[in-house]
């Protein structure tokens, strides 16, 4: 999936795909764990598979970015690295990005969805040029242990099963009322809506 769109707030979530975001105008905040990373035009962010992340827009004006979402089979030889490692600092600043990378990202945007082999080849170029600029650490070192991240991780690990809010709260060691408030305040939807969205997103990315 490759789209250029107006940047917006996106709640904490994770998926088993690589996500690359390139700011094309204005600014964007990329949240990973409890850290919020500021991005400006030309900066490129990398979110490896199964890393919880979110986006915030704090800058007035026109804020746009290109988002590339690549399933594991399209990242070929980089897939093994991305399963166990993640960037310590997930942003490559614009001054460190070769012009070729922007050209290739634009080429991916213009590639027909049916031309998966072409898009995959372009993606290999982006990764070959950029992965070496990221300091990779064990994935377990990237993230957070707070309740928001425990919640996202729990849903991601268990959404294929049948379970209730009460069962989830018990497993996380909190009351169901605390968990219910978390869904409404942080995710702006109830438990069932969030769980159904996770199942739908999985079906769409298969």
What does each of the following model-derived ranges do?
Residues 154-158, 193, 205-206:
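Short alpha-helical segment immediately N-terminal to, or the first helix within
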Residues 114-119, 141-146, 160:
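Cytosolic nucleotide-utilizing catalytic cores of signal-transduction proteins
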Residues 67-70, 109-112, 196, 200-206:
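Short, intrinsically disordered, charge-balanced linker/junction segments flanking boundaries
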Residues 1-86:
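N-terminal regulatory/effector-sensing and dimerization cores
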Residues 79-137, 153:
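Amphipathic alpha-helical segments enriched in hydrophobic/aromatic residues interleaved with Lys/Arg
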Residues 134, 162-198:
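Basic/polar phosphate-binding segments, predominantly the helix-turn-helix DNA-binding elements
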Residues 97, 143-151, 187, 196-199:
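N-terminal positioning helix adjacent to the helix-turn-helix/winged-helix DNA-binding module
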């Amino acid at each position: 999936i490759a789209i250029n769109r107006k940047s917006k707030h996106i709640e904490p979530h994770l998926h088993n795909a690589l996500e690359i975001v390139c700011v094309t105008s204005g600014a964007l905040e990329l949240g990973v764990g409890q850290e919020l990373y500021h991005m400006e035009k030309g900066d490129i962010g990398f979110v490896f598979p199964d890393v919880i992340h979110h986006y915030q827009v704090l800058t007035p004006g026109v804020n746009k970015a290109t988002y590339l979402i690549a399933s594991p089979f399209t990242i070929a030889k980089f897939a093994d690295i991305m399963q166990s490692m993640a960037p310590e600092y997930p942003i490559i600043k614009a001054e460190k990005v070769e012009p070729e990378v922007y050209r290739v990202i634009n080429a991916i945007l213009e590639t027909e969805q049916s031309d998966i082999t072409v898009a995959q080849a372009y993606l290999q170029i982006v990764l070959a040029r950029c992965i070496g600029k990221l300091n990779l650490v064990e994935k377990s070192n990237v993230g957070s242990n707070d309740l928001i991240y425990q919640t996202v991780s729990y849903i991601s690990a268990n959404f294929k099963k049948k379970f209730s809010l009460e069962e989830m709260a018990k497993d996380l060691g909190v009351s169901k009322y605390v968990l219910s408030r978390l869904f409404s305040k942080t995710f702006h939807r109830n438990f069932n809506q969030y769980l159904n969205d996770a199942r739908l997103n999985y079906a769409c990315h298969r």
